Amino acid sequence: MLEIRQNHCFYLFNWDEPRQDQTRFFSPEFWRRQGRISGTAQGRGITWFLQTVDLFGVNAALRHYYRGGLWGKINRDRYTFTSLENTRSFAEFRLLSRLHQAGMPVPKPLAAKVEKLSLGGYRADILTEKVENARDLTALLQTENLSDEAWRQIGKLIRRLHDLQICHTDLNAHNILVQQVKEQEKYWLLDFDKCGEKSGDFWKAQNLARLKRSFLKEAARMGIRFTEGDWKNLLKGYQN
């Protein structure tokens, strides 16, 4: 792990020795000039997909942090700085690193940046592994049914996360990825912004209830294939 400061910017890298141009890894233009941008995804902002296997051993996804909701229309990407470790990018990087080391199927964190601004503000970026040959669960469920065993596997995945006492504050069907690996499916969890460790067990049922609401919402909105039987199978996996 490498941490550096350059003027008003702070960087965290998932390697030990400095690399050429590493502070420019957060600029889409830097990657565009090298012809390494392979695609984009649109959310609150643009996620840039990068061809970086030769650099990092994996392809990468570059994301700038943006606010959502009504506040995001007024203040798109400025956050209040309290400490470096509490910034959005550094906190997500640290959590992903912990989960990755624990063997959880989450994107490997590659680098994080915090740019301090005047009046106690900051902006943030993160560079993570791109999960290949994958689509989010809602996209899959629009055209296919999952097997009972697949639902149980998703339940087991969430139980593993909860056993580590990690609360995914935005646990929903869009943040579960389905990856095709040698004719088998592997399930990943995404988007750990604002997530973290939580003691006790009281919150776990609430977290599962949040996930179920997201399935019901997308069943009504997008027509995804989801039944009460599917949910029961997910719970079986979670409980076993």
Curated annotation (Swiss-Prot):
EC number: 2.7.1.166
BP GO annotations: lipopolysaccharide core region biosynthetic process
Localization per record: Cell inner membrane
A GO CC term assigned to this protein in UniProt: plasma membrane
Uppermost EC category: transferase
Catalytic activity: an alpha-Kdo-(2->6)-lipid IVA + ATP = a 4-O-phospho-alpha-Kdo-(2->6)-lipid IVA + ADP + H(+)
Chief location category: membrane
Gene3D superfamilies: Transferase(Phosphotransferase) domain 1
Family annotation (Pfam families): Kdo
InterPro entries reported in the protein's UniProt record: KDO_kinase, Kinase-like_dom_sf
Pathway: Bacterial outer membrane biogenesis; LPS core biosynthesis
Membrane topology: Peripheral membrane protein
Coiled coil residues, start to end: none
GO molecular function: ATP binding; kinase activity; phosphotransferase activity, alcohol group as acceptor
Keywords carried by this UniProt record: ATP-binding, Cell inner membrane, Cell membrane, Kinase, Lipopolysaccharide biosynthesis, Membrane, Nucleotide-binding, Transferase
Active site: 170
Domain of life: Bacteria
Xref: HAMAP family: KDO_kinase
Role, per record: Catalyzes the ATP-dependent phosphorylation of the 3-deoxy-D-manno-octulosonic acid (Kdo) residue in Kdo-lipid IV(A) at the 4-OH position.
Family, per entry: Belongs to the protein kinase superfamily. KdkA/RfaP family.
Protein's name according to its UniProt entry: 3-deoxy-D-manno-octulosonic acid kinase
Protein encoded by which gene: kdkA
